[in-house]
């Protein structure tokens, strides 16, 4: 939803809610971990109240542990934290699960997938950033394909069940290859909301 029209957020949320999209992906930015500032809890609570979709909340913030219970209270279904922001990742993952949410971990483009090897079996989702986090509308980083393949091999090796999510620069040109490499979830922001017919664009992605 970062690429939505914030002046018409209800309209854009309703469009997604009535589309073939499976989830609503919400980027929470604090201006510290990433340069930008985005949605706060009151906005997310309002979105959840008026949406039937799974709420996939991506925390691009420092000290995410401080807010885990609050994000449960406002309706988050999936809560993803950055490995780069967590001093005690294993503890953070289990704190999320203790609140009955799905637990995800995000990796910045420069972060190796091997950095989360020891927690893979605890995860419901791994989000690979395919752009540098903090701003929408960036170009896709080509090395992401290799990281998806590496992560899929690790998933098979460890008999883990997490979903592989790709966030950033996703479009109809790179989506087929991402899926063939092993991606399960594609986050499309600018490609959807900047298109002439966002609902059809979502349908086109879902048809792949």
Predicted regions and their residues:
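Short gly/ser/thr-rich secondary-structure transition/capping motifs
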Residues: 7, 106-110, 168
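Acidic, divalent-metal-coordinating active-site segment for phosphoryl/phosphodiester hydrolysis
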Residues: 169-181
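Generic enzyme active-site microenvironment
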Residues: 25, 165-166
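Short, electropositive alpha-helical surface patch
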Residues: 76-84, 179-188
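Glycine-rich beta-strand-to-loop/alpha-helix junction loops that act as flexible
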Residues: 166-169, 187-191
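Conserved N-terminal beta1-alpha1 strand-loop-helix module at the mouth
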Residues: 1-80, 85-88, 95-98, 102-103, ...
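Short, acidic/turn-prone active-site loops that include or flank metal/cofactor-
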Residues: 84-86, 108-110, 131-135, 190-193
């Amino acid at each position: 939803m970062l690429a939505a029209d914030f002046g018409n957020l209800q309209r854009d949320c309703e469009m997604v809610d009535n589309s073939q999209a499976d989830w609503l992906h919400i980027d929470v930015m604090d201006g510290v971990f990433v340069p930008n500032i985005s949605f706060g809890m009151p906005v997310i609570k309002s979105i959840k109240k008026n949406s039937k979709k799974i709420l996939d909340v991506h925390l691009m913030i420092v000290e995410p542990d401080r807010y885990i219970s609050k994000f449960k209270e406002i309706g988050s279904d999936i809560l993803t934290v950055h490995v780069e922001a967590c001093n005690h990742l294993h503890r953070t993952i289990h704190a999320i699960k203790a609140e009955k949410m799905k637990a995800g971990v995000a990796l910045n483009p420069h972060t190796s997938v091997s950095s989360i090897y020891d927690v893979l079996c605890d995860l419901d989702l791994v989000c690979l950033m395919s752009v540098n986090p903090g701003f929408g509308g960036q170009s896709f980083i080509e090395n992401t394909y290799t990281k998806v393949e590496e992560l899929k091999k690790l998933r098979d090796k460890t008999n883990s069940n997490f979903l592989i999510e790709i966030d950033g620069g996703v479009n109809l040109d790179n989506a087929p290859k991402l899926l063939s490499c092993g991606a399960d979830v594609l986050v499309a922001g600018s490609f959807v909301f900047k298109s002439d017919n966002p609902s059809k664009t979502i349908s086109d992605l879902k048809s792949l």
